[in-house]
């Protein structure tokens, strides 16, 4: 028996231990070495005996026996003949499973080109031979001859000849030359290639050529040739002479009942190949006429093509039922292919699914599991227990007992289940909180019970949702489930670090109702000694829940030693709040409870509890809040009645007033005073404001009521209207929904997003008429269609994000970099959108943080900025901090913990081995379904408000101007003459409070550094035109302003004033094309004036459409406008919002009309114009001038002679991230993408930490283009991983060589995923064929670094608990450049505690895991 076990073990030993997977081309010899015999016949199975035919596709002699340890003819049976080869039927006696691994082969009678290397673009064969694909196909499919060896003739090698040309040539030169057709010809050409010689020639050509396209082509070819040389692949192997045959059990043939067979499509395809191959062999033996042989060869080529990749060339071969057959390539690609269906995720045993219902009495770490399900899921455990306890003698007996459901079985089940966590999962699993572990509680019935507080994480509700259960079987799995996945360990959301276990709906309503106060309630003014007495008073009916009373409250405050000390104060509060206080854990301040608690306040309460007292206290507290909330929501008796929807009286006046206004606009429109567009916009504006007013009146009406207080006076108090309470507490509904119930429904949108101008004036209480109902359905359908599309798109975005970031893991503690990102609060206009605290919380400081205005160091670099640190930063009003970031981390493959900062879901510095890439992808993708799908038409109503014309400050402080050039006009005010001027308001502490952009030509009432008071207007400008400001005083002199040629005169009918309008170049007569209208400012004598400070003439060129109101010779003062350029009011512009915008950003797509940025720093001038474009020239102080052609219709922000900095905006538009990276660097592009993505999420009210977006940006920036290669292994213009270049450069530095220079490249996430170093990961993502073809030709190695590759080869992933395993493997391989496993630092106290724990377990192994993991049940 022992031997048998040993033998079976030896059998199962496979090549487990490998570190790299290499892919390459298979040589014919290699294919033969894999093979166990040649398949000669197309037969499969004998349909009478069901035995495989000899030499056929299922031959037992080649592939192995059909039954375990039994030969085909039945001569040898049983184990004792193991390894014998039967002399009668030739079958080896062994296990059947060899039929899954033994391959066969087919010797092809004529070579066949591999379709992947032929047709997968760019064609590898074509690139290698430097021939167009069309020509190669003509040779392969026997339409032309190709010259292989020209000999002494005039022909060229590789020249194509038609049939006639070939005949002529043969007549002329007889057998001097060699020309063939078909794959043999291509094979011969490939075999004759001298790779090294070709490389040399190409390198020389590369040096000589100047044309960009040619360089690109040569580099491509050179790379391919080098890949062939390095990988040891031979070019002729791209043409096959031997075809491998897949093991038969991987392409099964299954007999169905009724004598029919179900077969894999591959068998049909192989049969076709074998038939044609055999026929070809016979034809060659018979020396058949050329044309027949040729046709047969062509058919063989086509059948092999279909086997490898059906439908890649020509029509796909179809089976009997008209559907294309599934070829080998189809087996591995797509959602149903091998990668995505079987390797990246599989269906598993020990799982079940059922509907979920509420379990309001459960504790947070529990879930209810129906007994029937538990019995089924825990079967093996029950069998084992029954046997070990001696209730059953054999497994079979145990099985019977379980099937009979004996009474003892249920007792055993309860025992087995105790402390055995199970995993619950709700599809779609959008983030890691979609699978959590719970302890099962056995329940009757068939539905599982779920704790209400985890619903938010699962995004579950109880309207029929189903959930799946999985059982972790091994001890390790149970331990992981309990220590990492238990719902009690997932209190915080990984996306933003806020609690995700927060009460919602009923619970919120109950707590809110409890903590409200009521004027003159029963028992008001009582004095009570403690909360217990308050509860007694409430229970006995002496006081109401909402009565205002005085109660002695005892709080526990930590002293210097960290012990809790009681402090008692007499507090004004309400009965309900005192009752709630009884469940508060020690150490929480009463002030947090002494207020009306809505959803936000309760969330804050739990967050505070987590930060002050840790996980255990928070979890218990959350549970208690839930029980209390449910109880008091029931007591409150809130309900919704039709009378609760109170319609304001004012509504009808407001509506009739609006109708009158609309009628007036209509009259103006009919008399031609306003255009159709203006009328539409105004009407919509009127109704929008009317709606707002109705809503305001309604809310005022609903939210307050007047009551008589104890003194007998009237007092206002918050209303106890049920609908209002639900919305106000945050339990359900919103002001917008109440508005539709009791106000007016308002304007509706059409499916394309435009607004219908007739609003719905009715609300739901009054009811809608048919027309109104119809208009409503219009927009509602769009909403449903949107949702369906959105889900798919969001899922695809998540998939791309996960794919690009999957291999990013924390691999070391500190990379030692001093780089970082400077964080400043995000201020738009007068509001602080995001505070500094939110931005830096949980990050690590990149340099010492100084107290503002001093040299005092508040915190040294590498401090983790937690809540306490942030409080101190706020107190000292620090307004910018340089923090470390993933984008600037120096770790080669992975990130270091210090650059990442805090693990948001745990609240401490992140652990090594944490898969931050996947977490980031999930955090960004999960809220994707909440984002809208729509593109917003911002026009009319919205943009009217956007045209600002002044800056009015909201805070007092002092002004700071940045990027400003200005002149002082004769009133002593500053006139701005620079483009992107920014005005910030700084408070007394030096903190930025407000931030505005000030346009060119604005007049400033205050200068830099001056004090302003709140409400003061500091800048004014005309929003509709852009002035051309004179920077000197003098007299106007027109240049090239010729009436009728370059300008036209227009006289205003109302005022009688005439003005000059400059014509566009395109509209001018030919004579005026080269004239450049300008205004010069000269002194009284007519001499030129130079602008002070710069040696530039005071001459202003006028663009087309500019309006000049001054006359020639008029006097101008400094800062006066010489001309005005009307700003075209941009019509309705589509602003892409929501999900598509996020996708565009991560894909780094170029916008339709991108902003034009200055490529270099210098002075702007305009060169000669061409048709439709003007030439922009930037001349730097030294070096070459830069020229760019810009379309005429682009509005430029610069004038001739203006100085621009590299990266300045020359023409407005959406900025291209690639340009930002090129001109302003990595920091700028990171900031741009992070802010733009956050903008979308903020609009939807979704909080995501910047870190996650930075992680994705890091992955988008991981490639670079080599600009100077020197003598390294890289080619110039090659795309390489930045980490690779860094490693090479460190080596070169040590050798004293100059470092390789490269330019960072920004790739979109799809491109970045496909450009990953791991071909396995890329192939399982998209474009499988292309990725594998490329990898095979280059002989790529996959180091199995990422998570995906390891999942595919069936290993632990190099993250989380598998991280140490992988580190050890690497260590054992003895590689020198390994990140050393850092030892976990324990303090002595920790060690003592751990030791005590372990001793306890050693003495009493049955001691509960729960105690060990702090899950003890003393929380009751």
Curated annotation (Swiss-Prot):
It comes from the Bacteria. Zn(2+) 2 binds at residues 815, 889, 896, 899. InterPro entries: DNA-dir_RpoC_beta_prime, DNA-dir_RpoC_beta_prime_bact, RNA_pol_asu, RNA_pol_N, RNA_pol_Rpb1_1, RNA_pol_Rpb1_3, RNA_pol_Rpb1_3_sf, RNA_pol_Rpb1_4. The RNAP catalytic core consists of 2 alpha, 1 beta, 1 beta' and 1 omega subunit. When a sigma factor is associated with the core the holoenzyme is formed, which can initiate transcription. DNA-dependent RNA polymerase catalyzes the transcription of DNA into RNA using the four ribonucleoside triphosphates as substrates. NCBIfam families: rpoC_TIGR. This is DNA-directed RNA polymerase subunit beta'. It comes from Mannheimia succiniciproducens (strain KCTC 0769BP / MBEL55E).
